[in-house]
Amino acid sequence: MVKAPSKPITLEEFLQQPETKPASEYIDGQIIQKPMPQGKHSTIQTELSTTINMVLKPHQVARAFSELRCTYGDRSTIPDISVFTWPRIPRDVNGEIANVFPISPDWAIEILSPEQSQTKVTKNILHSLNHGTQMGWLIDPNEQTVFVYLPKQQPDVFDQPEQLLPVPAFASGLSLSLGTVFGWLLE
């Protein structure tokens, strides 16, 4: 859903507004509300975040965050899962994880909801890649397909259960097949 303000607002003005439920993103001068996650989306998001954190977090390699606002390059988006390498996780003066993430994730993962535009989600992934993201995934639960995006390369499509999904180099300890990801929907 798009909310058209009576006059255009800046990114800074958008960031001063109260959060909405579901969350809204600021893209190309527009405020766009994300759809409310449904069962398949929520299952994959929870299981994938947990799996990534189980493998990468104990060794302080990286950490996965769900629904985290990332603001960079004149956009403020909320990837379904944002993975940051350990040294890039913003911290406050106490060394705790900061509330504001003014950088792109190292790995951006989006899970397509039935009412969501694949084009808009793909544009967010491409925007991230243009601002330092190493890899983007677009997971389509209805098609049981994962599109993998790398900077300045054509996307790869994974649609066979036995296919291993590529991960960024920092996540080389993580091994996931397409069948594993969509198998979570059967548990």
Predicted region positions:
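Gly/Pro/Ser/Thr-rich low-complexity, intrinsically disordered segments predominantly at protein N-termini
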Residues: 1-187
